[in-house]
Amino acid sequence: MGLYAAAAAVLAGVESRQGSLKGLVYSSNFQNLKQLYALVCETQRYSAVLDAVIASAGLLRAEKKLRPHLAKVLVYELLLGKGFRGGGGRWKALLGRHQARLKAELARLKVHRGVSRNEDLLQESSRPGQAYQVPRFVRVNTLKTRPEDAIDYFKRQGFSYQGRASSLEDLRALKGQHFLLDPLLPELLVFPAQTDLHEHPLYRAGHLILQDKASCLPAMLLSPPPGSHVIDACAAPGNKTSYIAALLKNQGKIFAFDQDAKRLAAMATLVARAGVSCCELAEKDFLTVSPSDQRYSQVQYILLDPSCSGSGMLSRQLEEHGEGTPSKERLQALAGFQQRALCHALRFPSLQRLVYSTCSLCQEENEDVVQEALQHNSGTFRLAPVLPTWPHRGLSTFPGSEHCLRASPETTLTGGFFIAVFERAEVVPTPAPQTDAMDPEPLSQVPKRKRRRKAAVGASMQPST
């Protein structure tokens, strides 16, 4: 299935409530998911405008075999998008017969509404507002290149490097070809919001990862040293996993689980392109993974980013016919799963640090889940005080909630996110070496006084000469 047919199928699925926009994109068989996702989002955003232009131009009357959703995608590409990709084939020829009329109807619509720009035709709720003011964050994949080399590459392409940002105001002021280094993450570059790098050669080669800053924080706060064993409990689509691998320098082991086969297949492609070699992928429900399994006996770090309502995702603002505000029943079901997954993760015997994160804004999925887990593991785990200067903290729903982090477009210029870092409050005893029950204690482990007594006894048992 080609790009335009795949985009039309996703639009039809969203409209008929077969699933969310992102979920339908991931379940498609199209190879370039990011390209498909971007095209569907933009077509959806201009949906009302495209319907008006198509109707007034009489396109569907003239082309009776052309389905409405495919027509919408094609007209978006012709009038508002990047032009037909890969030559466009028969679709370019088909739309070419109506190009003059379609352009005339778009111009007439602008005159009728008294606007000059395409985006001014959008409804207020669909215009580039707060969601489109969030900068474009680009993580340099240190498994393949260094931040300074990526910066030099962009400079040679005509971008103007402005150095390391010192405040959010520096990020808000970005425009044109300017870019910065993030003030917190040393491998994160920041570009103006509308910068599109999906076709950039460094991105296509896996040297760059297009990842929102808030999505980078869980791996950064987990911070496993090279050589560590790590579990990524709900791993797909894999951006966080690839960041963990970069922090490990591909030294150690990542056990990555996800029960969605299609998402896991897409993840396999992503981590391979990123040069990840220390990750073991498994199509498995994390709740079925046994903490007593010897394969995970050395796991000291767990990242748990479970399924959630996604209410903090910027893309939700584009899903006009999507799932909308999660219902009370759905929130309860999600929170129940999240609670089970978190308590399950805290049972791994060697665990020292766990990061729980969601892209949700709902208290039920965030502070409430964390509070319940702390109560069930009182005295064993506590919340770690992290990033004390981070401006947006957890809701004041329980003592210590200020150690949680929240993120939002308004306060941190990122997508909406929630993060809590658990650390073990007790020392895990080192297992004693295995010895035969009939063997005497190793001499090196006998206290000095006892050792002398044993030596004396041993001497008295020597044969006399």
Curated annotation (Swiss-Prot):
Main location: nucleus
Deleted gene: phenotype: Decreased body weight and lean mass without alterations in food intake. Adult mice show spatial cognitive deficits, possibly caused by defects in development and function of oligodendrocyte precursor cells. Mice display a reduction of the corpus callosum with a decline in the number of myelinated axons and loose myelin sheath. They also show impaired development of the cerebral cortex, characterized by impaired growth of radial glial scaffold.
Tissue and organ expression note: In the hippocampus, specifically expressed in adult hippocampal NG2-positive oligodendrocyte precursor cells (at protein level).
Reaction(s) catalysed by this chain's protein: a cytidine in 28S rRNA + S-adenosyl-L-methionine = a 5-methylcytidine in 28S rRNA + S-adenosyl-L-homocysteine + H(+)
Binding site for S-adenosyl-L-methionine: 234-240, 258, 263, 305
Modified residues (Phosphoserine): 167
Enzyme Commission designation: 2.1.1.-
PROSITE patterns registered for this protein in UniProt: SAM_MT_RSMB_NOP (PS51686)
Subcellular location(s) of the protein: Nucleus, Nucleolus
An example Gene Ontology molecular-function term: rRNA (cytosine-C5-)-methyltransferase activity
Cell inner membrane recorded as keyword: no
Gene Ontology BP, a term: oligodendrocyte development
Family matches, as InterPro entries: MeTrfase_RsmB-F_NOP2_cat, MeTrfase_RsmB-F_NOP2_dom, NSUN5_7_fdxn-like, NSUN5_RCM1_N, RCMT, SAM-dependent_MTases_sf
Region (Disordered): 430-465
Residues modified to N-acetylglycine: 2
Keyword Nuclease set for record: no
Function as written in the Swiss-Prot or TrEMBL entry: S-adenosyl-L-methionine-dependent methyltransferase that specifically methylates the C(5) position of cytosine 3438 (m5C3438) in 28S rRNA. m5C3782 promotes protein translation without affecting ribosome biogenesis and fidelity. Required for corpus callosum and cerebral cortex development.
Family: Belongs to the class I-like SAM-binding methyltransferase superfamily. RsmB/NOP family.
Name listed for the protein in its UniProt record: 28S rRNA (cytosine-C(5))-methyltransferase
Organism expressing this protein natively: Mus musculus
Gene: Nsun5
